[in-house]
């Protein structure tokens, strides 16, 4: 039995690691001309998100998730376009999926819209997950999505 225990502690012990890949949501800051957060006023504009040919109204897909009913797996809970903690979000999307030039259009209900493009890719380096993400707002590369509404 001592020999078996020693054999189980070899160099390949990382082979049995099971990774839980976190899901993600796209965070959209909505500010006024002075840079103040106005997300709380967004609902009155009745914004919609257009994604993969489908239209999602604000908060129409919000789900009350029963934590006890969830599995141990990190399944993406897609809620469409929603507000939470003073921010506007779209998602959740699976962190293990690849998105290349994915396009999300926010229609603001006042005749204006913004186009968000993004890339999301999970790559493995030295047996560790690395996430590569990039975002564009109306054709301009950005580090975070900040939309000014007056």
What are these regions (language model features)?
Residues 41, 45-105:
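Tryptophan-paired
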Residues 15-21, 38, 93-95:
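Short, solvent-exposed beta-strand/turn "edge" segments of beta-rich domains on protein surfaces
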Residues 30-40:
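Short amphipathic, basic-aromatic surface patches that mediate peripheral association
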Residues 2-27:
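Bacterial Sec-dependent N-terminal signal peptides
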Residues 27-30, 59:
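Surface-exposed molecular-recognition determinants
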Residues 31, 107-111:
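Beta-strand-rich extracellular modules
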């Amino acid at each position: 039995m001592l020999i078996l225990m020693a054999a189980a502690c070899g160099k390949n012990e990382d082979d049995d690691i099971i990774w839980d890949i976190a899901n993600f949501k796209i965070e959209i800051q909505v500010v006024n001309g002075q840079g103040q957060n106005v997300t709380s006023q967004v609902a009155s504009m009745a914004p919609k998100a257009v994604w993969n040919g489908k239209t999602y109204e604000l908060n129409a897909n919000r789900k009350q998730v029963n934590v006890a009913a969830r599995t141990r797996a990190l399944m993406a809970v897609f809620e469409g376009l929603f507000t939470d903690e003073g921010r506007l979000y779209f998602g959740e999307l699976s962190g293990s999926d690849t998105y290349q030039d994915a396009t999300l259009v926010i229609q603001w209900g006042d005749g204006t819209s913004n186009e968000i493009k993004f890339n999301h890719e999970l790559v493995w380096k030295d047996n560790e997950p690395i996430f590569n993400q990039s975002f564009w707002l109306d054709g301009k590369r950005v580090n975070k999505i900040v939309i000014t509404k007056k």
